[in-house]
């Protein structure tokens, strides 16, 4: 796997992961929720998970669906666990918490989600990746280079914008006591997508401020409905 192919696989599986997340979160509430840390239609954790699963399965030459199920679930759970730790350490936030689910580890991973990831791993190896690989192999080098560069540039821009959004959220929470009314609705709306995408969002430094922020957002949502 060359770098360009890896970039394409990462982009494709990040997009497919985003589709899974949107479907998983939107269907129960019967409305579209742009689920994901980034603003664009990608969930990088799925991209990383898919690449690691592909690498491990190829390296270990595993073909058994049962072994793929077990190893895929373990690999994906480790990545999810590490991602949650990194988000908490770097941004002081937790985007998900499985503490209310059975067989969870510190609320970072749980058996139910691990089982879903394990199932997706089997689908990836046995069904999805062979099709994706065949399509990419049919592309000429120039097309691959152009698509890969576009994906990388767009992803990097999205990461920068999204990280800036998290930093802005931290600044808003830090200054909640001096939150100016004239800027309130603007700032709330800018963070609305992120808050709605992760209703279990927690902040390790500004939990009370985050609770108030969510209440303000709820009031703004009710206000908009009546206008």
Where are these regions (language model features)?
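Aromatic-rich, lipid-facing transmembrane alpha helices and their immediate juxtamembrane interface loops
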Residues: 1-227
